[in-house]
Amino acid sequence: MTGKIFLDGGAGYIGSMLIGYLLDEGYKVTCFDNLLYDKTSLLAYCSHKNFNFIKGDVRNFELLKKEISKHDIIIPFSALVGAPLCEKNPLDAKLVNFEHVKYLAKNKSKDQLLLYNNSNSGLGETDGKSLATEETEFNPISLYGKTKYFGELAVRESENHLVFRLATIFGGSPRPRNDLLVNNLVLRALKDRVLIVYEGHYIRNYLHIRDVCKAFVFALDNWDKCKNEVYNLGNDNLNMSKLDLCKKINEYIPVEIIEAQYTKDLDKRNYKISSQKFYNKGFQCEYSLDDGIKELMQVYKMIDVPQYANY
């Protein structure tokens, strides 16, 4: 498949990586972003003949409507990501995470493709033993989890859609994020040689950012057999506790690991995820946790650490 893609929030952590994959596949990509966090993450694409940038805010619905009408595929990435940031900015969380997505879903044509990313954060707290599938009841706790889930529900009411529920993402990007769990723990290990972990028994599922990008391309290339469904998107080999994650990092960076209940996860994320439904379509993950740790060890030799976080 080729076509014109409208990707909002494309200057962010995943979007700035995904754009390169889409351009390599021959898509024409318009990135719509207000550049809240980073004004340089897209510079490498500016010379590409199929790349276009529009500086704009997704809360400007009239501008959104005008721009999406020119495209075949809509991929909304603009979001206030993470429970802490949404708690600080509840109105913007509702407008950006939910209302703008609902507007896109209602105002696109039936022939336009809409590819949405939700988060598995909405699962809330499970027993951490049984595998959560797409049929497992969603129970979002935080404002972040709720707004992302409401966005998913709006998308599912439209024709020609696909929803991914993303695992915890890790790895380097043109717009790095140091507040993601794996990235942050590698950074802390390198800087402090100590990892202080709370709720260490809590289990999460992880996925390398490049596998996220590959999954989006795969979905577009195989749209007819994938469309109008919800898919967990994670690495089934990476269901692991936070404490085991620290131990894996310790294999590469010698650290002292300390368990301390100094805070709590607002989303109470404790779950094992199965992404078998999407694997059954033919997708395979390529990047391991070891790959990501070694990559991040190189990344953190280069970047200005305090600059790259969402909250």
Where are these regions (language model features)?
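Conserved beta-loop-beta element that borders a ligand/cofactor-binding pocket
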Residues: 119, 152-173
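Conserved Rossmann-fold NAD(P)-dependent oxidoreductase catalytic core, especially the SDR/UDP-sugar
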Residues: 76, 102-141
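C-terminal substrate-binding subdomain of Rossmann-fold SDR/epimerase-dehydratase oxidoreductases
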Residues: 192-193, 197-311
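Active-site Tyr-X1-5-Lys
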Residues: 139-162, 190
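Flexible, glycine-rich beta-alpha linker
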Residues: 123-124, 139-143, 164-180
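NAD(P)H-binding glycine-rich loop region in Rossmannoid oxidoreductase-like domains
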Residues: 58-95
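Short alpha-helical oligomerization interface
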Residues: 83-100, 132-140
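N-terminal Rossmann/SDR dinucleotide-binding element
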Residues: 1-73
